Amino acid sequence: MKNINWKEEIIDFLKTLLVSFLVIFLFTKFIAKPVRVNQNSMYPTVLDQSVGITNIFSVEVLHDINRFDIVVVQTDDGKNLIKRVVGLPNDTISFKNDVLYVNGLPMEQPFLDEAYVNEEKAKYGLFTNDIEEITLGPDEIYCLGDNRPYSKDSREYGPFRESQVIGKGIFLLYPFNRFGGVE
């Protein structure tokens, strides 16, 4: 029978634990952060109570934010919101009769679920209330939830500063039937 050196075993275990914590810390500090959805504002794209991770590397290092990206923004009161970017710095945006206008040009929104939009239009007449023309500043973005009738977004909070974006995109881990990246 082999004699177990408990001191070495404990030291090996503590080393493994320390390395694991270090890897997790570095991963969540520089690459991706966990996110949990506590709202229906992105339905049906992302369901309430979904859990995933968001890419912070693209935002922190590459400063890569594009129109129609899904982002995680932090409000001034510290809430994290998952929204879609519809307006970029210096854009002029508006909504009229459910049409998004960017710099005066109508924009398609292919990411919206057409059946769901039509269902909500039948209930409320519009899916997205009209938004008066707004011109964004050099570091501002305008974000909306995909579930426009139920979303608290830039229409309520105003434009977000690019520095308020803490992650780009979401890779869903739960629910398991939606496992994978979200567009």
Give the positions of each predicted feature.
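Aromatic-capped interface at the extracytoplasmic side
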Residues: L26-M42
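Hydrophobic membrane-insertion alpha-helices, especially the h-region
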Residues: L14-F30
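Soluble "head" domains of membrane/secretory-pathway proteins
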Residues: K2-I10, L26, P44-E183
